[in-house]
Structure formats: structure tokens, C-alpha cells
Amino acid sequence: MRIALAQTNIIWEDKQANLARVEEFVIAADAEIVLFPEMSLTGFSMHTDVTAEICQPDAEIQSRAQMDSTPDMTNQPTTGWTIEQIKTLADRHHTTIGIGWVKKTEPLCENHYSIVTPDGKIAMDYAKIHPFSYGEEHAHFRGGEKLCTGRLGEFQAGLAICYDLRFPEQFRAMVPEAEIFIVPANWPESRVSHWKALLAARAIENQCYVAGVNCCGDMDGQYYSGDSGLYAPDGSLLVPTKEIRLTDALCKEEKLLVYDIQNDVAKIRKAFPVLQDRKEM
């Protein structure tokens, strides 16, 4: 499976400009799956009056519900402007795309990450469980309540967003289903040593792959160094099959990291059966 991590320099709160760059990165990656950072089209903004999107139930889900005499639309994927644009790009370029966006809810909004497939389906949709109180996210966003796992290529995947990475119990709760964790982030350079250590730790303790995709460059007074990467089940940082730098890169760290991986998680867990020895405390 070819998966690409798009380490982008997000243009602050400019959805149209960032959407154009998303398409550039998708074209350049030439991968089955391209993943973008948290809040991909706006940056980590608390200005929900600018970033939040009013959403409707996903058309396919709604259509199926209308044929059901007792439809249950609770916790079903919804779609707003960003997701509709990404559906178009996914179809146009025959690529599965992971994108971060903000859903308007009352009284607080939700920080979402969605996986959109080439056929226009929302394969996975996750609301960040742990708002980052140190950065005042909790004052503008409510925490999600549901774990999110689903199929991503040849892997069963689990989603988490940025600050969630500091809570190992969330990841353990998605095992043994999850074979790869996707962690989009806006993680500043000042704490990047934590980012790298925690990505490796989540891989080791759950014996699975972990893909951390971070932004880069200067945004709203913060500097982001990127340091995106794919970690193997033994915690090692994998060497990309290739790195791609766009000619119009906005900073020196902006690039695509492309990996070719096979699902060997079951084999690894069987050979060194740590998870089966765990006791509930």
C-alpha cells in the first residue's frame, strides 16, 4: 500500500488557498492514500466564526436512512463545504484523502478528521476526544465521545488527533482491531521531542504502525517543524520510499513523505505476543 504524508505549511484561515495546495500535493504524491494535518485548510485556529462549517447528513447515509422505516442518524458522518470539496478531489485523482476540518455544533464546535474515498464515501469520520486546554481549545471545541476505526487500504485503521496522542488508553481501546493509527496534528516545534517519542511509544505498546502527519512553518505566532513520519510496530522511524518537495514550497520543511508498506501486523503480534499477556488493572 502506498501512503503519503503531506507535511504542509498551512496558510492561516484561508480555505480556498489551502484547498488548491491540497490538490497540488495529491497530484504530486501519486499514492493510494494521502493524509493531511489537523485542521488542514485553516490551521489550529480558535476563530470558529471563520473556520466552522454547517453540516448536513452525508447524502449516501441519508438516502439509506430514508429507505429504513426506523432510521437512526445518531453519530453518522456529516458533510460540509470542506468534505464536499475533498470528495471532488478524491474522485478526480482516484485517491483516498484524509482531511481535518471544523464542524459547527452548539454551543461549542468539533474538531474533525475524515477519510474520503475515491467513490465519494466518508470511510471514517472522527471528532477529537481531547481538546487541548493549554491552548484554550476546550473553550471553543467540545470533546468527541466515540473512538473511530475503519478500513484504510489493506489495514484496519484507528484515528486520533494531535493532543489525543498523550492519552495511551485511547489507543489501547482501539486494539486489537487497529493495525495502523493515523495521527494528524498541529504540533509546535517547542514540544516536538514529545511528538516523536509519543508516536514511537504508541507504535511499540500496541504493536502497530503509527502515521503522524504534522504541519510546518509559521502560523499565528507558532513555529511548526513538521517531523512527520511513519513508525513501525517496533517503534522505529521508517525511511520514506521517496520525499517530494513541491517547487512552490512555502517553507523548507514543506514536503511529501511517501511510503510503501505491507500489513505484517498480525505476523508481528503472533511472533511476539505481548498484547495477549496484558491484564486488566
Task: Locate the predicted segments by residue.
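Active-site catalytic loop in hydrolytic enzyme cores
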Residues: K104-P176, S190-A197, V258, K267-D277, ...
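Short polar catalytic/cofactor-binding loops
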Residues: Q7-W12
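Cys-nucleophile CN-hydrolase/nitrilase-fold catalytic domain and related Cys-dependent amidase chemistry
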Residues: K15, E23-P118, D125, E189-C208
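A short acidic/small-residue loop/turn micro-motif
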Residues: I129-F132, I244-K252, I261-D264
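Extreme N-terminal starter segment of soluble prokaryotic enzymes
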Residues: M1-L5
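CN hydrolase (nitrilase-like) catalytic-core segments centered on the catalytic cysteine
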Residues: W81-G98, R166-E253
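Short beta->alpha transition motifs characteristic of CBS
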Residues: D49, S114, Y126-F132, G229, ...
